[in-house]
Amino acid sequence: MIHLYKTSTPSTRNGAVDSQVKSNPRNNLIHGQHHCGKGRNARGIITAGHRGGGHKRLYRKIDFRRNEKDTSGRIVTIEYDPNRNAYICLIHYGDGEKRYILHPRGAIIGDTIVSGTEVPISMGNALPLSTDMPLGTAIHNIEITLGKGGQLARAAGAVAKLIAKEGKSATLRLPSGEVRLISKNCSATVGQVGNVGVNQKSLGRAGSKCWLGKRPVVRGVVMNPVDHPHGGGEGRAPIGRKKPTTPWGYPALGRRSRKRNKYSDSLILRRRK
């Protein structure tokens, strides 16, 4: 449930927060982390802009492998995770194990999930693509390498679709629109990642975005020449180039940035949109 603030100041006029999701992590499932997400490399040079600051965070250990096989677990809590835009669930398994997983859309407290090779095709269950999973099934948290854990479709609202099976491979349509092959032995979780409307929630003020570690975005044309190729000039000057560029001088707005001659090129049937 989205809770709108009572308007007492201009900054709370348009702000919204989820009133049903709290953050009360278990001590054995968290650990401290060095806050290195400031967009700098080892030399202190900015390599990714608009990052820095933010509130201190504790890292939640998420079970992306789902290797608690054939043991049913119950959803005990649905919690906020400051390290991702998706919610997480605390699972109590029948053998006493407690783990966090990504919250599947529609899952509520008290639901039961299980992972294995012979489990039902229902929301939140994790199973290999080689099972009787029908074509068109919505999945998330998909493995690329067997046993490494889910790496694809993990963001809030992300969902991929199983569109074909042939030989030792399965064909998936990923959230980006890319169509690629994955080994059928890799596992995936049935359903869509929760918190679908995260991109529609209004933060209400600039300070709320600063708490998330996101710095203001500034146009290059208003910078100095030392800071951006578009900078400099007298008054409102044009960028002085035929085409826009990045802060490092590379062509911007549509240039392909993927490295060439990667092994996975042979597995990609259609590039992302």
From Swiss-Prot:
Entry GO MF terms:
rRNA binding; structural constituent of ribosome; transferase activity
- GO cellular-component term (any): mitochondrial large ribosomal subunit
Biased-composition ranges for Polar residues? Answer: 1-14
Q: Which UniProt keywords apply?
A: Chloroplast, Plastid, Ribonucleoprotein, Ribosomal protein
Against InterPro entries, the record matches this protein to:
NA-bd_OB-fold, Rib_uL2_dom2, Ribosomal_uL2, Ribosomal_uL2_bac/org-type, Ribosomal_uL2_C, Ribosomal_uL2_CS, Ribosomal_uL2_dom3, Ribosomal_uL2_RNA-bd_dom
Q: Name one GO biological process term.
A: mitochondrial translation
Q: Where in the cell is it found?
A: Plastid, Chloroplast
Q: Major place of localization?
A: plastid
Q: Which Pfam families match?
A: Ribosomal_L2, Ribosomal_L2_C
Region ranges (Disordered) = 1-25, 224-273
State the family named in the UniProt similarity comment for this chain.
Belongs to the universal ribosomal protein uL2 family.
Q: Which NCBIfam families match?
A: rplB_bact
| UniProt-listed HAMAP family | Ribosomal_uL2_B
Complexes and interactors = Part of the 50S ribosomal subunit.
UniProt protein name: Large ribosomal subunit protein uL2cz
Could you tell me which species this protein originates from?
Liriodendron tulipifera
